Each structure stands twice: as structure tokens, then as C-alpha cells.
Amino acid sequence: MKQLWTEVYRPKTVSDYVFTDEAQRQQVESWVKEKSIPHLLLSGSPGTGKTTLAKMLMHELEIDDMDILEINASRERGIDLVRDKIVNFSSTMPFGDFKIILLDEADYLTPEAQASMRGVMEANHQTARFILTCNYPHKIIPAIHSRCQGFHIAKTDQTEFTAR
């Protein structure tokens, strides 16, 4: 099976990922060392590596595939997503230490879905972590912002990663 070039060369470890901020590198390294993450809100322009960072973290934390729920919120964005998929997934015990719900393009979620998700984040914080990626963090309700560690990813100078 052929893979896209971007998938073949996607960074899989912290040392592969090109950070624009050394403090962010150190933060990610500490999460990997501790084998735990808080709820995360990864923001930045399209193509800055938000989803790549999320997937790299899941790989580095050795999260079992059965403990990962990936959702593209630009395709599924309403409250039924939270009620049907996220609640069911997050309310069961993980195979490992915790589950991860990756909501890619979370800024597409409706405000009602976000409000509902807030309760799920609170109720299942011991067994599930949320990683939200978004281009427009102002579209995420304050209640979600307050429950996530914000992580803005700046655009990388192309020469920083083409040299690798």
C-alpha cells in the first residue's frame, strides 16, 4: 500500500519535530518523560504541524490504538458527535493509563457541541485526555479554553526542516 509523502516523512519523535520555540520543545519533552499530558488546545495557521504534533505525542506516549479516537470536526461538528461518539468512548476504561480524543479542526464544532464536551472533559479527566487542534482559537468557547493548556504553533521557516 502506497502512503502519501507527508505521511512517510511525518515526524514521529520529539527530536524529529521542528519547534519554533525552545520552551515548547521542553514542555513536550517533559510530557513525554512523565508519560502524561493535560487537555491540549493546539492552535496555529493551516500547515503549521498541529495534527503532526498531536500524532507524535500519541506515538511518543505509546498510547494503544484502542485508546485513541480521532475525529475531524469539520466533517462531524454537532452535539450528536459528543453524545454518540465522545461520551461512549471516553466513559469506558482505557487499556493503558488514559485515552486520547483527538478533535482535529475543533473550531468547526458548534457552540452547543463544545458546551456539551466541557462536561465530558470534566467527568472523564482521570481516564481521557482531549487534544483539540484549531486554526481559529477565538471560535473555541471560554469554558474549553479554561480546561486546556493552550499551545500556539507558529509558522516554521521552511529552511529549518528542508535541511533535515
Regions flagged by a language model, labelled:
Residues M1-R164:
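P-loop/Walker A NTP-binding region and its immediately flanking N-terminal helices
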